[in-house]
Structure formats: C-alpha cells, structure tokens
Amino acid sequence: MLVPLSLLQKFFSSPLSIEEILQACDRIGIEAECSNVFPDSLNTVVTGKILSASPHPDAERLTVAIVFDGKGERQIICGAPNCRAGIIVPIALPGAKLRNASGEITTIKKAKVRGLESQGMCCGADELGFPHLQKAERGIFEFPADTPLGESACMLLAGAPLECSLTPNLGHCASLLGLAREISFLSPVSLNIPEEFSFASLPQETSICDMHDAGACPIFYSVKISGLSCRRSPEYLQAALTALGQKPLNAIVDITNYVMLSLGQPLHAYDSQAVEQKSLHAATLQSAQPLTLLNQETYTLPAGSLVVADQHNILGLAGVMGSAASSCSENTTEIILEAAYFQPQAVRKYQRTIQLHTEAAYRFTRGVDPQGVLPVLHAAIHMIQSLFPDAQISPIQKIGDDSFSPLSLSVRPKTIKRLLDIEFSTAEIVAKLSSLGFQTAVEEQAVRVEVPSYRHDIQEETDLVEEICRTTPFVQKTQKILPTYTPIYSLKRELTAFLANGGLQQFFTYSLLDTEVSSLSLQESSLIPVQNSSWKLRDSLLPGMLKSAATNLHRQAPYVYAFEIGNVYSKEQNRYQEEERVAILLSRQVMDDSWQGKTPLSFYTIKGWVEKLLCQSGASIEDFSLQPSQHPNFHPYQQAALYQKKHLLGIFGTLHPQLCRKAQIKHDVVFAELSLNVLLSLKKKSGPHYVPYPIYPASSRDITITIDRDLPADLVRRELLSFESKWLESVHIVSVYQGRDSASQSKNVSLRMVFRDHERTLSGQEIEEEYERLTALLDKKLANIGQGNS
C-alpha cells in the first residue's frame, strides 16, 4: 500500500518525522519503507506563492511574477497563461535540472528575459515528470490554497514514497485514516480528521426491499445526486490519487477512489440512467449468471454471489466491481452513489472463485468499519458538493439495520502473566487498552473490553494480550533463554529418527487435497471445499500417503514403507480443530523374492510397528487398550482403535480392499495413524531405562473364563492387572474360543498369569492362595457379564 506522507500528515494534530512514523509502524506490525525516488536536483523545486503578476513591458505574452518561496521574494518571468496572483505553484530554483519536451535536460539559472532578470522558473506538472497531472491546455501547476510554502514540490505531487505491507489481520489499517489512527495511539500526537472530510448530516429515508439479502449485507445506503458532469478532477485531487497509486479518471470516480483510500470505506457511483426506478439493493444470485464488469471482462458469477441490482438488472458484483453497463461516462449528469457493509465471508466466497482482485475487494474481505459507512458516504457527498456547488442531493435511502452491538471480551491478568510472563495490574491493563481506543470496565479479577467496530482482528482474549504486548517497551519484557526445542518438536525429531532408522521413507504430502486425492478415503469429511473449489483440507494423512504409495508402486518400486508427520483438520460442534499426527503405511510383500516364499503384510505387522512406536515415544503399552473399530477406510475385521482411558490415540489395521482398488494397488496395505498430542501427554519423563534380568524364577497359572461374545478379551486381562497384587507380574491372553454355533452369545477366554517375587522364590501354597484370591475378585467383578473358573 502506497502512503504519501504529505497526505498522512493531515490526519495528525501535529507533524511527525519519518523516523517516528516508521517506528510506530514497526510497533503496529507493519513493514514500512520510505525511499526518495527523485534526483537531488529536483529537491530544489519548492512550493511558492505568486504575490503579484503584471504584464512584461516588452512582451505581451510574458508575465512578471513576484513569488515568495518560503524564505524570501524573487522575481520570475513566466509565460504560462494561468500565471496570476494568489496561487501556489512549483518554483524551480537556480540549479534545478528539468527535462524539456524533447527529452533534453535543462539546468535552471538566473537569466535576463527581455531585459528583466528571472530568478527561477514556475513549472508545470509535465516538466517535473508528472504529465498525467497536466491539464489539456499548457500552464503551471496549481497547488491547493492551504499548501505549505517552501516544501518540496515533487514530494507533494508524488507524496513521499512510503510503502507499507499489511498482514491479513490489519485490514483496519488499509487507509490513511486507519493507519494514522494506529500511529496516533503509539505516538505523542492525536488523530485529526481533515476539513475536506467534514460533513453535515443529510436527511434519510428507510426503504424496505423484499429482495435485499440482509444476512450478507446488513446495511445498504444509496443517494441520488444530479447536476453533475464527468469532467477532469482538480489538479490537487489528481496529484493525491497519483500519490496513492491510482490513475485519475474523472471527478466522480476520483472522489470515490480518494475517499476509499483515505477513509477505508469503498463506494461506487452508478449512472442513474442505467438504474430502474432509481433504487438499488443487494441480492444473492439463485443461479449462475454472466456479467460484464468495468474492466470489460465477462465473468460467470456462481450461484450464491452477492450482487448490487435494481428491480430487474444486475448492476455490479457487490464489494468487488460495478458493471460496464452502469458505469459513469462523459455524458453522465446524474448518479446514484452507493455505500454498504458487505460481510467479509460473503465477498470472499465468490471473489476468489472468479479470481478478480480489486481495491474494494481487498478491504471488504478483511472487514470494513460497519459504523463508518454512513459518515464516509456523507464525506463523499461533501466533496462532490465542493466540486459541484449546484448539485442536487436527494435524501439518503437506507435498507437494513444500522444498529451495532460491539463484541465484549474479558482479559485477565493471569492470562497476560502466562503468555507474556509480565505482571500487570487491572489499572495498567485499563490504561494500555484505553490508549488503543478500547472501551474498558474493571470486573472481579478481569477487565471487560468492548472492541471497536473497525477491529475485526480482535476475536478472543489472546488478541487483547497481543495488543497489550505491542504497547509494552522491550525493557519491561522478561528476558529469558527459550528452550532449545519444544516438547512436541523433540518428540517429532525422535520419531522421525526412529522410523527412518527402521527403514521407512518419510513422505511430505499437501494439506490441501484435490478431488482425486480426497477420493482416496471412504470416510465422509466434515470440511467443505475451499471457496467452492475442488480443494479441501485433509482430515487424515491417509489420502495423500496412499496416492504417493500408489505412484511409487506403479513405477515398479518393490515395496513402500513410509511414514509422515503432519497436521490434519476437522470440524466439531461448529469449531475447527487442528491436530498433529504420525502415520505409517506399509505395502506389498515383506520378502517377495526370498526362498521362504512370500510373507504377506497383515494386521499384526502394523500392530508391531505401533507397539514399537509407543515404546520409542516413552509411553507404556500397559497404558493403552485395544478396542473394536468400525472405521470405513479399514477392513471391517482387521482394524483396531487404540485408547488411553477415554482418549483415542489412533486407529490401525489393514486398509479396505475397495480403497486399495480405488488407488489401483493390487496388494494389501496396512496403515496406522496416531495422535502426537496424546502420545506426548503419556510420554514418561524418565524415558526408557534399563531393567535387569530377574534372579528368582516365576510361576504361572492359567484361567479360563466365559464372557459375553461382544466384550473384548483384553478387558479380562486388564481387570486382573488392576487388582492390587505384589506378586502378579503379567497376564497374557492364551486363546479365545467361540463355538461354531452362531447363536452362541458367549466365548471362552484363556489367560496365563505370571507370579514372581524379586527377593525370594515363591512357594506353591503362596501362589495358589494368590491365584484363588485374584480369581475370586475377577468372578465378583464380572458377575454381571459372565463367570470364570480356573
């Protein structure tokens, strides 16, 4: 964004230096750079006021002008037809170098013209390198009457080249007013609204339109203005627009562009001859329709697009660009000026679909000030009246509700302490947020904050903490050495090294999936495609990994052993979630050419990798339980879900044959996907450690118990391990038997209990007594679902 310093300074109560402005931009979070693009010789072209102008005694086409250049008076002989007393013009002092019409450079010197000395030159815009600002007739350039004297004329014409790069969250700074407001909060000056944007409120009429989409456009204003002409803008307005990076067109369009760039609210002027019944509203298209816009390109607007229309015709794509049919031409004498608040998500939805980027869309997609729509419209009307004193203004038509309920948030000192490691009292919090334009009120152990209407980037408590942070000098911030790695990063490094050393290749796949890749999943995603396109965020690492595996296998890779660590996305209860996961994919035979024959991959192959992954993560396998799973991407009888209490760690097993056929893979594929966050929460601080071999023998006893067929056998094993016993070392499942009778509702589970004391050898009687005690506890525990006996 181009920001002319000369225009920006108008919004301050007193001037700021370039250094002060750049420092404030740094604190706001804006990357700003200012460089002088003019040669040094043009720095001697300054603004001066013609005090008197009299005809040359020896040349009827020349004028003798007495000019004050801010330091003193000087005599200049001028041949421009518009040279007259009272105007402020560019003055080239002796030593300045100007390029003439033929391209030759001329050095300005003191000289005698027809016997009278000329101590400089009054310049036109074309002579300074701004030919587009020059009027059709030749003449010297005229500055506004309030232009300071002795200032660099080129800097005023082009506006010192301050270039600002705005991040997406700083949409409220995408105007001179927005940027000046933020700078004033962090500088010793106050905000000042220039007189050219002052206005008097005009009468309003509320209209009701059944076709208006109040959801996508809460408030819509329009006003009819007649008695106009699309002549060229005054030179000062052309200069200001050029400095802001816009090409001047005509007075009406230039005013709407200038007001938008200055105040941040896009406006649009329609030729009223193209508007039926002189009435506009915002409507949503029910079906796709073509529309030719101002750039003379025809676009197919998708269904759901928000448009500005009259009773029968589409006159513009709301928040993006008007139609060619309703544009202002040299014959336009009456316009309908529109100002509205379009919801950012509504504009963003179709603006990206048709790939049309405009200054208006840039602002609407980031959010404009809903309470600034009417004041900006009044300011534009005021500027039109100043250029066209005979213009007739009709009452403003309002559609929708202009009431506004500010977002209310609370910020707590303990949250600031946790995030910034700085302690602030409630009084300090109130002072800092109040200085940034927030309305505050002290509550118990918190500060209640009302967010201004223009701050769309403030949505939660952490955003307010960020505001407090940027008003806090670095010297107040705690200085401490950050940890080398975060725990999650360290875990990812460990797992990456472990899996790579185990012979697995690391995959890196895209988070955005197209239609082809996203089809490699039989699970329906809760995420919708991005902006009505075919791309959507992945909710699993499987589709991308399966596509990459298929590509490598089709290129005759002997096998694919791969893993990936990445983010997946989901939507639960209208909230979007992001989670990091680790996934393993194995495909084809393990030993294809071995003399032993083919050893196919199976459920137990991937189960072994999952167990090794848990051990490497520092988690105990005993902390987890396997439970039946019915995930559509896996074989219905070869999959399992891994739980830690009630927390799902992940799912693993053999992929569904239908999914393999979709990917055109002829061999079985086994896959596992685990949550890194759950793994991290279970990681033991001590990590793996050495355990010596026992020196005393163990004794085992078997038990067979009958339970309901739907209960997992591992449930019995875990129940036994849950009983307090100083000798029970481990419990293993020996077998699970279910009769051939399909009507049977029970199954037999055989388990082996291992007993050991690490300080002595247990006697047979001690083992039997402990065995009987544990089986009795188990029978009692499972009394409602089955009976067990040894």
UniProtKB/Swiss-Prot annotation:
Gene3D superfamilies: 3.30.56.10, Bira Bifunctional Protein, Domain 2, Ferrodoxin-fold anticodon-binding domain, Nucleic acid-binding proteins, Phenylalanyl-trna Synthetase, Chain B, domain 3. GO terms for molecular function: ATP binding; magnesium ion binding; phenylalanine-tRNA ligase activity; tRNA binding. It is found in: Cytoplasm. Residues 404-483 form the B5 domain. Its EC number is 6.1.1.20. It is an enzyme of class 6 (ligase). One of its GO terms (cellular component) is phenylalanine-tRNA ligase complex. Tetramer of two alpha and two beta subunits. This is Phenylalanine--tRNA ligase beta subunit.
